[in-house]
Amino acid sequence: MARTVHCIKLGKEAEGLDFAPYPGDLGKRIYDNVSKQAWADWIKHQTMLVNENRLNLADARARQYLARQMENHFFGSGADAAAGYVPPSA
């Protein structure tokens, strides 16, 4: 049986993550409060941030920026929008 959490991002009960996706206290908070669906949404947003801002993940500052954005996305006022991103029109 799948583990469920009350997802802080979706505001409903949903399937929880299988393991903490990030080390430390932030990873534990995410594991306890974020669903698989919300985590997948974050991965898509993180990919846009990396691509649109041309972040080099070998740079510690870029990784720190993404960690702050991840915390804001789930537990704060929301992550930055991807600069220059234009959603496709239907």
Swiss-Prot record:
S-S pairs: none
Biological process, per Gene Ontology: cellular response to oxidative stress
Keywords of the record: Iron
Superkingdom of origin: Bacteria
Signal peptide: none
Keyword Iron on entry: yes
SUPFAM superfamilies (UniProt xref): YggX-like
Any one GO MF annotation of this record: iron ion binding
Keyword Nuclease attributed: no
Function of the molecule: Could be a mediator in iron transactions between iron acquisition and iron-requiring processes, such as synthesis and/or repair of Fe-S clusters in biosynthetic enzymes.
NCBIfam families: PRK05408.1 (NF003817)
PANTHER family named among the record's database cross-references: FE(2+)-TRAFFICKING PROTEIN-RELATED
Protein's recorded name: Probable Fe(2+)-trafficking protein
Gene source species: Acidovorax ebreus (strain TPSY) (Diaphorobacter sp. (strain TPSY))
